[in-house]
Amino acid sequence: MNIKHRVILSVSMVVLLILIGGPSGAGRQTQPDLVLVAAERSHTEVITSSQQSFSITAPADTPLENASIQLEVVAGEAVNPHLRSSGAVDCSSLKSVVADVVTPGMNSEEKALALWRFVMDACYHGRWGTSLDGLEHLNVYGYGYCGTYAAVLESLWWTAGLTARHVNIGNHAATEVYYDNSWHYIDADTRAFYLLKDNRTIASLEELNDNPELWTMLRRGSSRKAGKKQYYMTMHPNGHGRSPVYTNDFSMAKGDVMTLGWQSRGKWCLNRGEEGGKEPAWEPPYYGNGLFRFHRDFANPSQSRSGLVSSTNIDWQDGEAGYLHPQKAKQEASLVYRVKTPYFMPEATLSGRFLRKGTSDSLELDISTDNGKRWVTIWRAEGTGSVKGSAVTTQTQQVTTNVPWKYSYLMRLRMRAGKSSRDVGAYNLESASVLAYNLRCLPALRQGANRITFSDEAKASRTVKVTYSWRDDLPVRLSNDTPMEGEQVSVSVRVANRGAAEAVNVPVFLYFGNPSQGGVEIGRETIARIPAGGSGLATFSWKATRKIAGKAVNPGAQLYAVVNPDNRVPESDETNNSFSRTVKVLNPPDVRIPSESFIRFESVKERPQSLAIVATVRNLSNSAAHGLFLDDQAAGESVVVTVYDGNPAKGGKEIGRETIPKLLPLEYRNVSVQWDIAQIKGAHTVYVQIHPPVNLTRALGVKTSSTMAVPIDLDAYRRCKGK
């Protein structure tokens, strides 16, 4: 066969291979590529001043998922860098929390309740205590029990200018706040406060002890017995409890990067606190993990002194070497740096690039978590030449809330030159510390316009890059992004085809929970065709729930969409076929009059022939079993309250009505309707009817009204009034 024929045959074989899709995946380039992806967004701002603001605008009509915040020091040193977002409460200090939560014109009770509500939205009940410093608990942990809740709430009350106290009432730390010349018991851990019989005044612990029947919000069947309080404790008025004082001050120098992510990576604090015992703590249901990268490049020694605690026998003047080395041979040289962050550090990786010319030269990396009293060696150089060293340690678990140098550790490099001082040295030194923190206190973005403010206390010039990353235009969309438990919602899954060929009969599955971990299938649909470069939509009906086997899933319902799970449709990339999204499913509002004792008859001074019927209506939606936070409960919207003389089902006459625009979880309102009794005598039964909130009816269909009836003898009322 001549060359010409061999060439023609070769070309023909190539064409044939392309047409039949082989070999080595050549045909995959002409296949579809089915993907479930969101739009990945980011915004980077370069900061050069001590205070600088910028705007980030996210779509207002589509859900947004925060991904990460990154601070990178490009030049100089940032001292106590701080970010504030208009979309979140600023938790950098107790004062900033109060400034964001308390609004002008609030009275003392409104301030106390607003801060109480904030604490229940920022923290959740855990199985053990954490910090007794309010600011630390907010930022670092966010979970705990009564004592830690008290540390946060009482500190915030003091900061707001209120007087507060922490009361031990027997295996429970309670909080009271003082205003209007009396104490008032308001508890964030148990999510409760109780009203006196006037249905207006929040009771104190003394008053509850005197009237044990008030110990339930319903005032029905309380088995509580009056008891003595064991002792009183008052948190320090500057906002700190018994824990060593927490500070979120820290510095970052050139090369340092802090990344705060919205995902948990399986790294948390194993310490249970003072009362939790010695066993390792279970994984909290809700927390975030980030990373702090501490980096010192010794090519320019003059820029490597930030964070330096001490140096011994180090030649800082030899700039020509390109690395740091001992000043004198045969003597140990050392560098000690402090790594400090505002957050708990479950583990750290210490690393660097070093020089070790011979076996007589030595290099070691040590860590100290007790401020230099004790050192643990975690790495020794074994090779020679240019050596890369790295070691992972969980020694940082010891730097907890109980030590005054929280959250920091010392990193030490020790080296010794056997012959010449230049025979051993360090080109760079680095640590990567995993961070654990309360996600609810990060400066997050919200839908729509966001204003971000960076500030620090650096006196010299510095350049910092701030990058926000988030996802929007999610491929899994709901007809209602915050449905109520039991609400029927439509879920649409958008499948894009980024390949070069059309896809037909594309199967799409939707699960509640991760299908690889026992997730429950919601449904399956088939998209008839998705053209190359186009997209298709699969629509499902889902009865919203966050419960699996009767138990609520936190922090919300995980919806998993999977396209082409069995690879029935040949495609070029099978690694991008799933997407998950967390949906906050709300516990429906429970709006009612707790009991008959919450309906009172009061005289009207300016209208002696009228009687005021005052009904206390409360949203009792408060199931800690449904969700971690109070905002997992739904508000009641447009609640109509109608008062009747007689049973409305049997022709009772309407006296009047009032609409409550909104009732937040645990909020109450006193509805007052005036009844003209000038021509009415004798015994009557007043019925107060609570119509279901409009948003409840819209979500779950028509619901029956709740009715409470109380008798009144108008003749007896007049006789008492005459006295």
Describe each region flagged by the PLM.
Residues 35-38, 196, 200-308:
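Alpha-helical and coiled-coil interaction segments, frequently adjacent to or embedded
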Residues 343-357, 491-493:
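A short beta-strand element within beta-rich, extracytoplasmic domains
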Residues 407, 416-471:
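Exposed low-complexity, polar/acidic, P/S/T/G-rich flexible segments that act as propeptides
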Residues 319-347, 394-396:
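Short beta-strands within extracellular/lumenal beta-sheet-rich domains
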Residues 366-370:
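Conserved Ser/Thr-centered positions that define the repeating blades of beta-propeller domains
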